[in-house]
Amino acid sequence: MSIIDTRTPEPKRFISGATGDWEVVIGMEVHAQVTSESKLFSGASTAFGAEPNSNVSLVDAAMPGMLPVINLECVRQAVRTGIGLNAQINLKSVFDRKNYFYPDLPQGYQISQFKQPIVGEGKIMISVGPDNKGQFEDVEIGIERLHLEQDAGKSMHDQHPTMSYVDLNRSGVALMEIVSKPDLRSSDEARAYLTKLRTIVRYLGTCDGNMDEGSMRADVNVSVHRPGGEFGTRCEIKNVNSIRFVGQAIEYEARRQIAILEDGGVIDQETRLFDPVKGETRSMRSKEEAHDYRYFPDPDLLPLEFNQAFVDALAAKLPELPDVKKQRLVETLGISVYDASILVTEKAIADYYEAVAEGRDGKAAANWVINDLLGALNKAGKDIEESPISPAQLGAIIDLIKEGTISGKIAKDLFEIVWNEGGDPKKLVEERGMKQVTDTGAIEKAVDDVIAANPDKVEQAKAKPTLAGWFVGQVMKAMGGKANPQAVNELVKSKLGIEE
C-alpha cells in the first residue's frame, strides 16, 4: 500500500431501486484531439476558431487521387500518451477504413484503427473522495486500448432555415480514442477518471483537454445489473463535453434503466444523447456493431512500424506525471494527500506551488495557494496563468508572517492589496504602516483598557476561560489588527489569571 492509498473496507455504493439494489457498470471512450500543428494525414492547420472551411486541404476534402501521408508528430504524441497510461506500446499497428455515410465525412469512411491499435492495454489509478471520514479510495481503472483516427467535420443546422451547412475544418484532425475497460462503478468514479485522464494528457502536452472547445469528448457506456449477476445491456451516451455532464448523464441513465427493468421491461442497446438543459438522455439511434462498419485495412496506408528505441527515446523525455509528483510533494514537503491531490490537478498549479514552497514551509505554502490564491482565482474566473500575484510575491507574504513582521490577519489584507494593485509586499508593509505591533508596553495598555471597560466579562472569563478569546478579539480590534496575536493572547490570560 502506497502513502497515497487510504482505501477503506466499505463496500461499493449501490443504487437503491424499488425492488432492491442495483450496480451500475460504466465504460468510457474518450476522444482526445492530438496536440499537433497539422492534421493526421495532411498538412492543413488544426487551429481552433478559424473561418469555416479555411483549414481544409485536398486530402481533407477527399478529392480524387489525393493520398494520405501519416503525420509523425501525431504518432509520437500517441506513444507518449500510451506510456503515460502505463500501457503496452505496439511496435506495429494498422490503419483501417471505418465505413459509414454522413455529410461531414467527405471520404465516405473514417481512417481509424480496429484490430491492431498503436497502444494496447494499460491502467491508471484514480482517487475517489474524500468520504465523510476525510479518506480517499484508490481505484485502478483498466485501459483497453488507444488508437489514432481522423475526426469528422461539423454539420451546422442553425445557419439557414431550410439548409444545413458543413464545416470541414475539423475533418482529418488527429484524435486519440482512449477506451477504458468497464471498471467504473459510479458517476463519482467516472468523473474522477475523466479528470485524471485530462490531467495526464495535459501534463504530457499531447492534448489541451479543453472540453468546451471539443478537443476532448466522452462517449459513456452505461448498464445496470443486480449485484453478483451478469452485466446488463449497455447504452452509449455520445459526445458528452464536460465532466459535470458526464456525472449527470450517468445518474439519469442508470435510473432510467432501473425503472424500465423494475417495470418488467427490457433495455434496448442503443445510442443516446444527453440534454444538459433537461438533465436527461434521449434516444438517437440503435447501437451499431463492428460488422456494421465493414472495417478493412486502408490500402493507401502501409502498416505503421517503429522500434523499441523510438519508444525508449520518447519515454526518456517525459515530464513528471501527476501520481509521481503527488507522492513526491507529500514525502518531501509534508503536505496532506488531499492538498497534494488539489495541487497536481493542473501542472501550472503544481509549478506555481513549488515555486512558492521553495525554501519555505510546505504546509503554509499549500494553505495560501489552495485557500487564498485558488479561491481568489475561482471567484475572479481566472486561470493560474492569469494570476495577478506571482509566486515570488506570495512567497514574500509568507516570509513576512514567519518573520513576525505582520500577523495572519494583516497578511490577508496585504494579499488583497497586492492582488488589486501589485507591488513588492515588503515595501507595501513599510509604506502603509502595516507592521504588527510587538511592543509589549503598547499591547499591555490596550489589554488593560479592554479589561477595565468590561468588568462583568472579567468575572465570567475566570469561570469560563474560553471567554479569553473575546478579550483577545477586542484588543486586536482596538489596535487595528496590528498587534501580535500571540503576545495579546498571553497578556490577556496573564491579566485574567487564567492558567495555560
Curated annotation (Swiss-Prot):
EC numbers: 6.3.5.-
Family matches, as InterPro entries: Asn/Gln-tRNA_amidoTrfase_suB/E, Asn/Gln-tRNA_Trfase_suB/E_cat, Asn/Gln_amidotransferase, Asn/Gln_tRNA_amidoTrase-B-like, GatB, GatB_C_1, GatB_Yqey_C_2, Gln-tRNA_amidoTrfase_suB_CS
GO molecular function: asparaginyl-tRNA synthase (glutamine-hydrolyzing) activity; ATP binding; glutaminyl-tRNA synthase (glutamine-hydrolyzing) activity
Example GO BP: translation
SUPFAM superfamilies: GatB/YqeY motif, Glutamine synthetase/guanido kinase
Domain of life: Bacteria
Chemical reaction(s) catalysed: L-glutamyl-tRNA(Gln) + L-glutamine + ATP + H2O = L-glutaminyl-tRNA(Gln) + L-glutamate + ADP + phosphate + H(+); L-aspartyl-tRNA(Asn) + L-glutamine + ATP + H2O = L-asparaginyl-tRNA(Asn) + L-glutamate + ADP + phosphate + 2 H(+)
SMART domains named among the record's database cross-references: GatB_Yqey
Any matching Pfam family: GatB_Yqey
Keywords: ATP-binding, Ligase, Nucleotide-binding, Protein biosynthesis
Task of the protein: Allows the formation of correctly charged Asn-tRNA(Asn) or Gln-tRNA(Gln) through the transamidation of misacylated Asp-tRNA(Asn) or Glu-tRNA(Gln) in organisms which lack either or both of asparaginyl-tRNA or glutaminyl-tRNA synthetases. The reaction takes place in the presence of glutamine and ATP through an activated phospho-Asp-tRNA(Asn) or phospho-Glu-tRNA(Gln).
Assembly, per entry: Heterotrimer of A, B and C subunits.
Record-stated family: Belongs to the GatB/GatE family. GatB subfamily.
Official protein name in the record: Aspartyl/glutamyl-tRNA(Asn/Gln) amidotransferase subunit B
Organism: Brucella ovis (strain ATCC 25840 / 63/290 / NCTC 10512)
Lineage: Bacteria, Pseudomonadati, Pseudomonadota, Alphaproteobacteria, Hyphomicrobiales
